[in-house]
């Protein structure tokens, strides 16, 4: 007789197969609609366990740079619809709505910046510059995957043996993090990820807070940056290095350098501070095993704002035992509108969030699996099982 664990595993496997089927159908339909020149830009080599040959698939960004692939603006409207169908296949309804809103925020940001920001292209803030690429043959016997990314969005999916096996790194950002709408409620795409974390930290007693709060000020960015592989001791990356290639225009290089330097100076961090919040194999902060029932409910709700980005059954199921392995770390004040950062880290889990730039109105959030981002683990196993 099947146990509950067996039934849950079977249900998750079925969900991952159904999602892979939807992805394959959507990817094939999009590729079939492209002309040869578009298709050449839209496709890449099949995923591989070899880091060198798989390097492009493992490259990701969250800055307004070329993320690799065919840009939305280089597609006809009917092709764009098919592209968004593929994007939606890898997201929950709430996840898709959030991504669509983030893309539209580039129009809002253009207004905030006075329509004058120049990134060396025709339009500095451009919702047409989100890029989609398919790696390998959708639905084929070999592993395949797809990536969608642009300013403040990065989605990375891998399918092996007809099953979705990786959905990380998964990055959502928002600039502005809060902007006015008609009526009393502002537009805040990442409100849940910020408000639930603040509520959780503010619920801690003095002893818990002393362990959770690493510093009274926040770093300028997420600590892991856009690294393909995370390592013990990783520290914040300078803004100019989170772009594809080097800036050919000295003026743009100077602009990005000054922006990064300004963010770093505003953080007030010195070398010891960076070391304090550096990534580590042993999680920093407060073990959540000691949280009370109400606090654990808050933590689960917070985790859902990350793990709920993808369709049901694709994110890891964190039972009580898995939850007990998570640590909560916070840096910065806890007041509304103040720069802050937090991290949730446990086995096969790293979540980072910061809202520090633009006077704490520019947020970054990322969900990662340090051991298996991009499907490192399953690609190696697939290679061993199917090749001499």
Q: Where are each of the predicted segments found?
A:
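A cross-kingdom marker for long, charged
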Residues: 2-8, 13-36, 40-74, 81-92, ...
């Amino acid at each position: 007789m099947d146990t509950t664990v067996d039934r849950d595993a079977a249900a998750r496997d079925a969900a991952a197969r159904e999602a892979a089927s939807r992805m394959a159908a959507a990817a094939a339909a999009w590729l079939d609609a492209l002309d040869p020149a578009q298709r050449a830009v839209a496709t890449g080599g099949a995923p591989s366990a070899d880091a060198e040959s798989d390097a492009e698939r493992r490259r990701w960004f969250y800055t307004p740079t070329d993320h690799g692939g065919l840009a939305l603006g280089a597609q006809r409207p009917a092709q764009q619809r098919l592209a968004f169908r593929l994007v939606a296949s890898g997201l929950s309804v709430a996840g898709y709505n959030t991504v669509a809103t983030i893309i539209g925020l580039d129009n809002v940001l253009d207004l905030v910046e006075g329509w004058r920001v120049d990134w060396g292209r025709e339009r500095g803030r451009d919702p047409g510059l989100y890029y989609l690429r398919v790696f390998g043959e959708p639905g084929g016997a070999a592993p395949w995957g797809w990536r969608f990314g642009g300013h403040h969005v990065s989605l990375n999916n891998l399918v092996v043996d007809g099953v979705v096996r990786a959905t990380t790194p998964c990055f959502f950002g928002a600039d502005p993090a809060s902007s006015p709408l008609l009526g009393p409620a502002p537009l805040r795409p990442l409100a849940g990820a910020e408000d639930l974390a603040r509520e959780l930290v503010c619920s801690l007693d003095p002893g818990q807070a002393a362990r959770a709060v690493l510093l009274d000020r926040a770093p300028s960015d997420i600590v892991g940056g856009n690294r393909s592989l995370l390592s013990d001791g990783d520290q914040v990356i300078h803004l100019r290095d989170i772009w594809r290639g080097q800036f050919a225009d000295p003026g743009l290089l100077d602009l990005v350098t000054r922006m990064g330097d300004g963010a770093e100076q505003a953080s007030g961090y010195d070398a010891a501070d960076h070391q304090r919040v550096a990534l580590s194999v042993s999680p920093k902060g407060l073990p959540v095993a000691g949280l009370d029932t109400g606090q654990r409910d808050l933590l689960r709700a917070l985790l859902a704002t990350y793990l709920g980005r993808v369709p049901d059954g694709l994110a890891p199921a964190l039972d009580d035992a898995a939850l007990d392995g998570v640590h909560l770390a916070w840096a910065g004040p806890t007041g509304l509108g103040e720069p802050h950062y937090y991290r949730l880290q446990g086995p096969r889990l790293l979540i980072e969030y910061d809202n520090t730039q633009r006077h704490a109105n520019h947020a970054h959030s990322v969900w990662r699996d340090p051991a298996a981002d991009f499907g490192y683990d399953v690609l190696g196993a697939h290679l061993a099982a199917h090749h001499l």
